[in-house]
Amino acid sequence: MWVCSTLWRVRTPARQWRGLLPASGCHGPAASSYSASAEPARVRALVYGHHGDPAKVVELKNLELAAVRGSDVRVKMLAAPINPSDINMIQGNYGFLPELPAVGGNEGVAQVVAVGSNVTGLKPGDWVIPANAGLGTWRTEAVFSEEALIQVPSDIPLQSAATLGVNPCTAYRMLMDFEQLQPGDSVIQNASNSGVGQAVIQIAAALGLRTINVVRDRPDIQKLSDRLKSLGAEHVITEEELRRPEMKNFFKDMPQPRLALNCVGGKSSTELLRQLARGGTMVTYGGMAKQPVVASVSLLIFKDLKLRGFWLSQWKKDHSPDQFKELILTLCDLIRRGQLTAPACSQVPLQDYQSALEASMKPFISSKQILTM
């Protein structure tokens, strides 16, 4: 299997209300493209004023757009997904929470409409994505600082650009940062049909890694298995199959995994640990089951397993903006080669946000909801 050498080389151990009026920090003279006396532009945004059930607390509102100053960039949002982290943030269950009221959405792609006089790295027509979480992407237009945005090539598919900044980055870093994997090594993961899971399958295949992909049983399990295998998955098994003694037969023809990726917790994480090779690592990046990770004492002692966690926001804090930009460009190269595609998506107009929010929280929904503006 062809292995992209660039992939192996990149191995490195605001508020959301910003840009809308009224808000503290909204400012005076417009950029040269705008008249300071012009009527403020009106934009639509999905706003929540308190934490709770997203389907109940999120509202579509008309808001005024702030003027563009020297270091600002006005953008038109093109598409923005609904991720689990977005839901958790609205519910009030996340690693950081924006000041309220806030605009929802941590990810998406936008097109630059105008720039301030001090902006040097962007121009109208460029595509951009958020540099960090918390920007508030569920809106039609916004004014952000130049440093809050990262340019991405406009020759990649819109859905790929809209879903580039969170899940593929998480997948790539987990594959690269915790074990020194080599082509032919194997990786096991749960929640394999999630956005991160699908990215793991594809990036692992590009790296020459073999994957064991665990999913919950469901009526259309064969259809799901076929789709994941079309992405590059070597094995797709259910949670029930993972618990069977026959699992040991997997490792007659492939090495035991040195890396396990856990997005579920509870019994599922315990079973992942059981499959790891001695000295292997399980990385937890989510907790869909809302149950603690349970690690067998004997596994920790006799197999010397390691338990780690990963949060992309923390990785960004620990690394420079240039390193994140390099990561984005590496993933864009994969997209251009056809080795990384967007997860299965359903595009939903912004005004139909209620149905999109409800669908994103239903079990066994493999299609990511993407809001289009």
Curated annotation (Swiss-Prot):
The modification N6-acetyllysine is found at K61, K252, K267. InterPro entries: ADH-like_C, ADH-like_N, GroES-like_sf, Mito_Enoyl-ACP_Reductase, NAD(P)-bd_dom_sf, PKS_ER. NADP(+) binds at residues 167, 193-196, 216-218, 285-288, 310-312, 368. Residues 1-53 form a transit peptide. Keywords: Acetylation, Cytoplasm, Disease variant, Dystonia, Fatty acid biosynthesis, Fatty acid metabolism, Lipid biosynthesis, Lipid metabolism, Mitochondrion, NADP, Nucleus, Oxidoreductase, Transit peptide. The keyword Lipid biosynthesis applies. GO terms for molecular function: enoyl-[acyl-carrier-protein] reductase (NADPH) activity. The keyword Acetylation applies. Catalyzes the NADPH-dependent reduction of trans-2-enoyl thioesters in mitochondrial fatty acid synthesis (fatty acid synthesis type II). Fatty acid chain elongation in mitochondria uses acyl carrier protein (ACP) as an acyl group carrier, but the enzyme accepts both ACP and CoA thioesters as substrates in vitro. Displays a preference for medium-chain over short- and long-chain substrates. May provide the octanoyl chain used for lipoic acid biosynthesis, regulating protein lipoylation and mitochondrial respiratory activity particularly in Purkinje cells. This is Enoyl-[acyl-carrier-protein] reductase, mitochondrial. It comes from Homo sapiens. The gene is MECR.
